[in-house]
């Protein structure tokens, strides 16, 4: 079955460790894509985000890795990824 409607999963909780300071960052990720016939369940989008966020990570790379993985796996018409995190390394240092 062909699908071409935008698919969005919003505000998925993510947890990571800052690769520079080894302290936690927590936040939310929202992922959207426009299918090119292929769709996956919403839980798969959350799993992809979780997989990348479990690594020592910076927020910018996490965002790019999730978007790139979806582009490679699903080959959609387009992908959008928004990550908003609170970084303990910034909170602790002021």
Swiss-Prot record:
Q: In which pathway does it act?
A: Cofactor biosynthesis; 7,8-dihydroneopterin triphosphate biosynthesis; 7,8-dihydroneopterin triphosphate from GTP: step 1/1
Q: Which UniProt keywords apply?
A: Allosteric enzyme, Folate biosynthesis, GTP-binding, Hydrolase, Metal-binding, Nucleotide-binding, Zinc
Q: Which SUPFAM superfamilies match?
A: Tetrahydrobiopterin biosynthesis enzymes-like
Which reactions is this enzyme annotated as catalysing?
A: GTP + H2O = 7,8-dihydroneopterin 3'-triphosphate + formate + H(+)
Record's GO cellular component, any one? cytoplasm
Q: Name one GO molecular function term.
A: GTP cyclohydrolase I activity
Q: Which positions bind Zn(2+)?
A: 18, 21, 89
A biological process (GO) of this protein is: folic acid biosynthetic process
Q: Which cysteines are joined by disulfide bonds?
A: none
Instruction: Describe regulators of its activity.
Output: GTP shows a positive allosteric effect, and tetrahydrobiopterin inhibits the enzyme activity.
Q: What is its EC number?
A: 3.5.4.16
Q: InterPro entries in the record, alphabetically?
A: GTP-CH-I_C/QueF (IPR043133), GTP_CycHdrlase_I (IPR001474), GTP_CycHdrlase_I_CS (IPR018234), GTP_CycHdrlase_I_dom (IPR020602)
Q: Subunit details for this protein?
A: Toroid-shaped homodecamer, composed of two pentamers of five dimers.
Q: Which family does it belong to?
A: Belongs to the GTP cyclohydrolase I family.
What this chain does, per the entry, is described as: GTP cyclohydrolase 1 is the first enzyme in the biosynthetic pathway leading to folic acid.
Name the UniProt record assigns to this protein: GTP cyclohydrolase 1
Q: Which species expresses this protein natively?
A: Phycomyces blakesleeanus
């Amino acid at each position: 079955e062909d699908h071409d409607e935008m698919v969005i999963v919003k505000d998925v909780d993510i947890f990571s460790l800052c690769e520079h300071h080894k302290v936690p960052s927590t936040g939310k990720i929202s992922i959207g894509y426009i299918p090119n016939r292929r769709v996956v369940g919403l839980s798969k989008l959350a799993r992809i985000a979780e997989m990348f966020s479990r690594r020592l990570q910076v927020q910018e790379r996490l965002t790019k890795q999730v978007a790139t993985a979806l582009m490679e796996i699903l080959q959609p018409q387009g992908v959008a990824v928004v990550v908003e995190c609170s970084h303990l390394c910034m909170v602790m240092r002021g």
